[in-house]
């Protein structure tokens, strides 16, 4: 069976400095905002998402190690939606799109 892969939306977090204005906002919260915005821009529901891929480099807490999964669920995707992180340092975002 042939399946078509479609990228319906891409969103990123703000770029800040280490210890700057976003220091008190957990990465998983920022990522969940990104998921919600991507769903809104694509005019789709979380239950319709097949996979979630996040480019993510620095883990600040143990729960950040699976940031993509936490973000997917907290952002509105179904608990059955698979997710994975990509760590390619500066190229993480681009690798997430390619993956």
Placement of each model-derived feature along the sequence:
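Generic secondary-structure signature for well-ordered alpha-helical cores
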Residues: 13-16, 39-44, 73-77
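N-terminal structural subdomain of ketosynthase/condensing enzymes
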Residues: 42, 50-57
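Short, well-ordered amphipathic alpha-helical segments that serve as non-catalytic structural scaffolds
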Residues: 28-43, 67-71, 96
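Short acidic capping loops at alpha-helix termini that bridge into adjacent secondary structure
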Residues: 45-51, 80-82
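Condensing-enzyme catalytic core mediating Claisen C-C bond formation in acyl metabolism
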Residues: 1-25, 37
């Amino acid at each position: 069976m042939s399946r078509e892969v479609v990228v319906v939306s891409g969103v990123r977090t703000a770029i800040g400095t280490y210890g700057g204005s976003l220091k008190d906002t957990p990465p998983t919260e920022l990522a969940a905002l990104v998921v919600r915005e991507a769903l809104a821009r694509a005019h789709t529901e979380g239950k319709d998402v097949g996979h979630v891929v996040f480019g993510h480099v620095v883990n600040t807490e143990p729960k950040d190690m699976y940031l993509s999964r936490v973000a997917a669920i907290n952002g509105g995707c179904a608990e059955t939606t698979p997710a994975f992180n990509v760590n390619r340092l500066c190229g993480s975002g681009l690798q997430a799109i390619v993956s």
